[in-house]
Regions:
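Catalytic alpha-helical scaffold of carbohydrate-active enzymes acting on polysaccharides/glycoconjugates
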Residues: 1-132, 137-186
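Catalytic grooves of carbohydrate-active enzymes
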Residues: 182-199
Length: 199
């Protein structure tokens, strides 16, 4: 284990990455497809797009902070005006596949299709090509990371094995920058695992 103090650019003391997973109602639909008939449950995701995005953007602007919005391609297609606003305000739009697929359960070909469709949707809506990738709920395989690299991703933000960025060995002679995440810093576990039977 390397316990040396990291050397950050410009003599900075530390680095942090603020990320938002912009799943909208898609998160709920992927957990349980029957949610399509549950307006209250769907409204939890729709609220983020109706009010949450604008409020987050306002706070970020007020504080002078830039963030990364990991976005499924489907969400970009459903909410193009929100995605364009995020881009116009100078935030990064990164890929969260196409339709919140559990990449670990897909074949390599299916993963590639989800990656490709997600990237193309963001390109079509925003005119930018994402360079960062997060698998929905971090469910992925080593093949997923190789596919991300193949499709031009500069980094992944999925794994929880460090608190510093590092080069992840893809076991094929290549590496991909990993910017680790930590579930204890997410709001999702406190929220998502309590939606049944109340809704």
């Amino acid at each position: 284990m390397n316990l040396e103090k990291p050397k950050w650019p410009d003599g900075k003391k530390c680095a942090a990455m603020l990320t938002i997973n912009l799943n909208a109602e898609l998160f709920w639909l992927q957990i349980d497809p029957s949610c399509k008939d549950m307006p209250k449950t769907l409204s939890l995701g729709q609220y983020g797009m109706t009010r949450g995005v604008d409020r987050i953007l306002s706070i970020l602007k007020e504080r002078g902070i830039k963030a990364t919005f990991f976005t499924p391609g489907w969400v970009a297609e459903q909410y193009p005006d929100k995605l364009k606003k995020i881009k116009e305000e100078g935030h990064e739009i990164a890929s969260l596949a196409y339709k919140h697929e559990n990449m670990a359960l897909l074949t390599e070909e299916e993963q590639e299709e989800a990656m490709k469709k997600g990237i193309e949707a963001i390109q079509n809506v925003c005119g930018v090509t994402p360079v960062g990738f997060r698998a929905p709920e971090g469910e992925l395989t080593l093949d997923t990371l190789r596919i991300a690299k193949k499709y031009g991703m500069h980094y992944s933000s999925n794994l929880c094995d460090d608190d510093r960025p590092y080069q992840k060995d893809l076991e094929n002679g290549e590496t991909l920058l990993e910017i680790p995440i930590h579930w204890d810093n997410y709001d999702l576990p406190y929220f998502a695992f309590n939606y049944h039977p109340a809704f």
